[in-house]
């Protein structure tokens, strides 16, 4: 998932970079790339933006799919069903993601041929996505399912995301889009894709890898309560928008006349937003409560998980692996636990570690100030921040940093016998 996402990034983000550069020249130097005066074209911006913008949706969702593909097999106690088809489906999604952007322009006069082509590609991209849904369902089939907080998010994701996906296919029909375009139906579709698809995955992954990051687990009862509140809040907030959108409620308007009849649906959506907010408040409280009261005496592998990071202590040491693991299968740690063999062979060796540095965040701070100054034409501040940014780069380039070394003895002492013992499956 990460590999394919980064390939999309390599091809998609240069388009956005060029578009933003052209917009900057329009604002600061009086060019007319996007202004209709002197031969510019505003639709050029729309096309450049969405050539990046729609692959960006898959830049968001593919890592989330990877998280679900890690969590669901762990708590179903089964191998991921159809691993090769899952990979192939992601490849197809990444390719098709560059050929769907013009579905945002069905109603803007681009012609029947263009509308037909992009309608086909938009509906076609649902096929590999649907394959992934069925593979997750087949992974759950006959599995020994454990309903933990990460698994609850993953299970709730499937029906809610399917609602968002099916309505996306509806939006892909160019003829019907004249009814949907710029209505609350579109808003509901987007949020029913992004919240279950991305936000649920982030929350599931946060809960799942929290013990590996910090050495203690988040409270399960509070975690499940938050998951249910967020799922219910999502449905209550956005399902009414499908109805009001089909009834003609336009988006991007701050108020509506009472005579439109949208008041009831908007009030229900408001209640759903409140439920969503309560769910996120519970998550924040869970972090506070668990940080203060949770036990720090947890095993390296509290979930009985599958991937290699669970073979090292929790929280993970700075050097990660004291010995390089021997990987012979796709789920090497899972296989090692089943066979009773160790992943780690050979002697401890000295590890060279870099020193800590504040240069990256300082450079990023200068770059933030530079962008702010350029937007508001604060030229002196822009020059100072630009010099500061390049100064950080130059300093970092020529900084002598020999780092430090961790001896084999130190590592053998840090790695307890717990590392070599595996939970029974």
Which residues does each PLM region occupy?
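...captures the hydrophobic TM-helix bundle architecture rather than a specific catalytic motif
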Residues: 1-417
């Amino acid at each position: 998932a990460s590999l394919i996402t980064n390939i999309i990034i390599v091809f998609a983000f240069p388009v956005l970079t060029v578009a933003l550069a052209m917009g900057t020249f329009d604002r600061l130097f009086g060019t007319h790339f996007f202004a209709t005066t002197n031969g510019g074209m505003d639709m050029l911006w729309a096309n450049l933006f969405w050539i990046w913008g729609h692959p960006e949706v898959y830049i968001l969702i593919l890592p989330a799919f990877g998280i679900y593909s890690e969590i669901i097999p762990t708590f179903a106690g089964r191998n991921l069903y159809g691993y090769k088809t899952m990979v192939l489906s992601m490849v197809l999604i990444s390719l098709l993601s560059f050929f769907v952007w013009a579905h945002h322009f069905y109603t803007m006069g681009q012609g029947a041929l263009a509308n037909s082509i992009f309608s086909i590609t938009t509906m076609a991209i649902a096929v590999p996505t649907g394959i992934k849904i069925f593979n997750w369902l087949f992974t759950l089939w006959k599995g020994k399912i454990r309903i933990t907080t990460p698994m609850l998010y993953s299970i709730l994701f499937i029906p809610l995301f399917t609602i968002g996906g099916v309505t996306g296919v509806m939006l892909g029909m160019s003829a019907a889009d004249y009814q949907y375009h710029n209505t609350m139906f579109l808003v509901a579709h987007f949020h029913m894709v992004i919240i279950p698809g991305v936000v649920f995955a982030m929350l599931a992954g946060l809960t799942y890898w929290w013990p590996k990051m910090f050495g203690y687990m988040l409270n399960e009862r509070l975690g499940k309560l938050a998951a249910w509140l967020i799922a219910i809040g999502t449905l209550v907030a956005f399902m009414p928008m499908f109805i009001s959108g089909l009834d003609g409620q336009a988006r991007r308007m701050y108020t509506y006349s009472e005579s439109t009849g949208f008041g009831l649906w908007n009030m229900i959506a408001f209640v759903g937003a409140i439920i969503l907010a309560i769910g996120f408040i519970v998550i924040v409280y869970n972090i506070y409560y668990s940080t203060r009261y949770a036990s720090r005496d947890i095993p390296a592998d509290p979930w009985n998980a599958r991937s290699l990071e669970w073979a090292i202590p929790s929280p993970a040491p700075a050097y990660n692996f004291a010995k390089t693991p021997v990987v012979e299968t796709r789920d090497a740690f899972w296989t090692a636990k089943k066979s009773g063999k160790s992943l780690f062979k050979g002697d401890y060796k000295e590890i060279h570690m870099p020193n800590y540095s504040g240069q990256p965040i300082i450079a990023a701070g200068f770059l933030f100030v530079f962008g702010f100054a350029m937007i508001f034409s604060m030229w002196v501040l822009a020059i100072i921040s630009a010099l500061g940014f390049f100064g950080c780069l130059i300093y970092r380039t020529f900084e002598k940093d020999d780092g430090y070394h961790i001896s084999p003895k130190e590592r053998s002492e840090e790695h307890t016998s717990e590392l070599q013992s595996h939970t029974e499956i």
